[in-house]
């Protein structure tokens, strides 16, 4: 663990000490090296033990895929922000790189934490760099409103979580995940224990986000720069799912009786957000709402607590992290040229950027879970486990899958086809090799994981 954590920490002084002309290349090279080194965490499917670094940190089959995803996204964020920062002075470029690296360190510590208070601290620490990225480097004035939404939604859920953890430590004298899973708290259906259950899970529900608590997400995505959208869609939403999977293991038998409203709301949210996506005019907002629907599937799978559902949740989180991040990158390539996110004003891109159409097609097919993608593996696994829990869920999940196919095809056809391009788009610059490299680095892991999905399974 430390042989990867220390190089991450050393990237902070490196970004301030390296020469002006070498800043982007140095940080990019080192972060790619860390991303490749993180692959050593992968283990054969029959070796499902926890690797301890110390009593507070460790790596197991649930956290490993998310840790590797975090390490993989950092160099992509640095690479995709190159054009966004081209007009910025050197000190701001260094500050931006430092913010991204500190976010990577916080996420790595959160995913590898085996002690609840360390996990809570790092869970909250990710808020500060993300808020700085949204409010300082966002494109519109509304970024301040988006930052306020993001801050207050997250903090409202975090205070009950802190109180619940303090209460847990007072009663059991430990916050170690392993001890609490082996010797779980003796919970009853009393009001106190019910409120404690809600307090422990509410912060993660908001982070996912659960339908009804999701209003901060479209605002944050739309106003954030491309690096902010990538880390939000790619990793930060998964922090909520990871927290639910970890915490629910010690909340039995209350979860079986109290999870019904949340599972119903998350499954209903798949249909509602899908219908919202069909009526969206803003491209980034469409991708953000599609994330809410897919994360609803993950919430219901995590609360179901069967080995099959948790495996499906992890597969879908990894698949969504890469595919939605790729969609945001593609939306950014259009925005950098047209300075517009409206679907009707940026149509017929195929005639202007023909190579980008291939990436748009692949990303849309991944997002709609076409066979044999890992998105389909994750969705099918979750749908099967939900069907075995309650047969009626097949109506909601089936409708949700149909609507997601509709809005994915609508997004692709609107952006790529539609007659003659508008006049304001006739003189846009062609696509760069850097942009194709970014898309390839998103797509290659998705294709390779199709060949060996056992790397993400937990049983």
Curated annotation (Swiss-Prot):
The chain crosses the membrane at residues 22-42, 61-81, 94-113, 114-134, 146-166, 197-217, 225-245, 258-278, 285-304, 308-330, 352-372, 380-400, 437-457. GO terms for biological process: ATP synthesis coupled electron transport; electron transport coupled proton transport. Its main location: mitochondrion. One of its GO terms (molecular function) is NADH dehydrogenase (ubiquinone) activity. It is found in: Mitochondrion membrane. It comes from the Eukaryota. It catalyses: a ubiquinone + NADH + 5 H(+)(in) = a ubiquinol + NAD(+) + 4 H(+)(out). Keywords: Electron transport, Membrane, Mitochondrion, NAD, Respiratory chain, Translocase, Transmembrane, Transmembrane helix, Transport, Ubiquinone. GO terms for cellular component: mitochondrial membrane. Its EC number is 7.1.1.2. InterPro entries: NADH4_N, NADH_Q_OxRdtase_chainM/4, NADH_UbQ_OxRdtase, ND/Mrp_TM. It is a multi-pass membrane protein. It is an enzyme of class 7 (translocase). Core subunit of the mitochondrial membrane respiratory chain NADH dehydrogenase (Complex I) that is believed to belong to the minimal assembly required for catalysis. Complex I functions in the transfer of electrons from NADH to the respiratory chain. The immediate electron acceptor for the enzyme is believed to be ubiquinone. Belongs to the complex I subunit 4 family. This is NADH-ubiquinone oxidoreductase chain 4. It comes from Pelomedusa subrufa. The lineage of its organism: Eukaryota, Metazoa, Chordata, Craniata, Vertebrata.
């Amino acid at each position: 663990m430390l042989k990867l954590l220390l190089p991450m920490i050393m990237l902070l002084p490196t970004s301030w000490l390296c020469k002006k002309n070498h800043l982007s290349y140095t940080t990019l090279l080192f972060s790619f090296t860390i991303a490749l080194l993180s692959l050593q965490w992968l283990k054969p499917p029959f070796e499902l033990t926890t690797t301890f670094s110390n009593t507070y940190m460790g790596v197991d089959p649930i956290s490993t895929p998310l840790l590797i995803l975090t390490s993989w996204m950092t160099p992509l964020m640095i690479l995709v922000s190159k054009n966004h920062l081209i007009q910025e002075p050197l000190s701001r470029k260094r500050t931006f790189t430092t913010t991204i690296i500190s976010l990577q360190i916080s996420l790595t510590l959160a995913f590898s934490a085996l002690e609840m208070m360390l996990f809570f601290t790092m869970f909250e620490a990710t808020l500060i760099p993300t808020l700085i990225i949204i409010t300082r480097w966002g494109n519109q004035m509304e970024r301040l409103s988006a930052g306020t939404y993001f801050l207050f939604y997250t903090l409202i859920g975090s205070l009950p979580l802190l109180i619940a953890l303090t209460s847990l430590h007072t009663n059991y004298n430990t916050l170690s995940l392993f001890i609490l899973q082996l010797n779980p708290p003796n919970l009853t259906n009393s009001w106190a224990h019910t409120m404690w259950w809600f307090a422990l899970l509410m912060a993660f529900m908001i982070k996912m986000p659960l339908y009804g608590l999701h209003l901060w997400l479209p605002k944050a995505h739309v106003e954030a720069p491309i690096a902010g959208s990538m880390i939000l869609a790619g990793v930060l939403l998964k922090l909520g799912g990871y927290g639910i999977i970890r915490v629910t293991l010690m909340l039995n038998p209350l979860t079986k009786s109290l999870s019904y409203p949340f599972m119903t709301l998350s499954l209903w949210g798949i249909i509602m957000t899908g219908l919202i996506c069909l009526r969206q005019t803003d491209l980034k907002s469409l991708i953000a709402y599609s994330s809410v629907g897919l994360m609803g599937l993950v919430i219901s799978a995590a609360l179901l607590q069967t080995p099959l559902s948790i495996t499906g949740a992890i597969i879908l989180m990894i698949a969504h992290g890469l595919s939605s991040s790729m969609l945001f990158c593609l939306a950014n390539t259009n925005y950098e040229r047209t300075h517009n996110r409206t679907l009707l004003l940026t149509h017929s891109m195929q005639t202007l950027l023909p190579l980008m159409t291939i990436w748009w097609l692949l990303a849309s097919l991944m997002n709609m879970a076409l066979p044999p993608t890992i998105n389909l593996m994750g969705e099918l696994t979750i749908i099967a486990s939900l069907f075995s829990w309650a047969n009626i869920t097949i109506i909601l999940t089936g409708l949700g899958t149909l609507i997601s196919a509709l809005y994915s095809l609508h997004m692709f056809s609107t952006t790529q086809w539609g007659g003659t391009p508008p006049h304001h788009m006739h003189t846009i610059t062609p696509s760069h090799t850097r942009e194709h490299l970014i898309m390839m680095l998103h797509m290659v892991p998705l294709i390779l994981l199709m060949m060996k999905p056992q790397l993400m399974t937990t049983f």
